[in-house]
Amino acid sequence: ASDVYKRQDYTSTTSPGDTTYYVSFNSGNDENDGKSEDKPFKNLGKINSITFNPGDIIKFKSGESWKGYFKLRGSGSEDKPISIENYSSGNKPIIDGDGYQAAVFIENMEYVNISGLELTNQASHKFTNGSVKLMDQSSRTGLDLRFGLLVLRHGSGNIRNININDIKISDIYPTPNNSDNNHQGYGIRFESLNDDNVLNYYNGIQMENLDILNTGHYGIHIVNRMSGAQADYYHRNIVIKNSKFTDNGGSGIVLARCKDVVVENSEFKGSGSGKDSRMWNRGSSLWTYTCN
């Protein structure tokens, strides 16, 4: 697996769109153009430095692994989403968040498809020299909160069509100073924030063929942080299907301020697990509150 590389180590560029990029840690080079299997990029920092556009596809090579975080930039369109996939044969490519708050971070983006990856994240939130690992020099750390995939919305406007398929997520735990926060590890979280009471919501979340196991808290958490938000601002049109939730320290799925939700053909085993001392050790298979 790679060392941690950040986008600040690279010159920022913008993709023209409708372009496929390949990433291989074992055979790649960040001096390549990344546009063929023969000349792939190498590091997460390189693709973190690119702003993608509609029709772009980012492909990670199967059987390989990276340490650090992948923060996707740019948005797709209704007819041309941005897609994250794998290529070649073998096991799913692994992104190990290595103590950053999230292995994959999507912020204020829409029309995105993610498939065919494996995510994990339980290493220390500090480098060996004691400095804290920060995503893009933000205040977000993996100290008290940790995610496999974090999808975040703040500011005005709604987010449409985020599709997640065939993803494995396991071993998501923070490294807090206070052991009371040991359990704050989540497989996937969709979250909208209350910025000066500007209301927003997700419209169109589809997740299928997921395998989420060994998280400190919830497997999937979809939440709207708007204080007093009415049902007009609930997240909506959410489908979760054909998925497995195993030994999550809290509930398998938790939905808050959501409506028009379908959960089907999914399996829950060991919800509320305490088999690891970092787990919450309390939870149900599926829990909803303040939902329609």
Segments from the language model and where they lie:
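Short, well-ordered beta-to-alpha junction loops that form the rim of enzyme active sites
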Residues: 61-64, 222-223, 255-257
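Short, flexible helix-coil linker/hinge segments at the edges of structured domains or between repeats
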Residues: 178-185, 272, 276-281
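Extracellular beta-strand-rich solenoid/capping regions of secreted or surface-exposed proteins
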Residues: 45, 49-54, 65-83, 92-160, ...
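Short, small-residue-biased leader/transition segments that mark boundaries at the very start
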Residues: 1-5
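Extracellular beta-strand repeat scaffolds in secreted/surface proteins
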Residues: 56-60, 85
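Right-handed parallel beta-helix
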Residues: 81, 85-90, 110-121, 157-173, ...
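Loop/turn elements at helix/coil->beta-strand transitions in domains of secreted/extracellular proteins
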Residues: 17-19, 53-57
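Right-handed parallel beta-helix/beta-solenoid
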Residues: 6-46, 62-64, 87
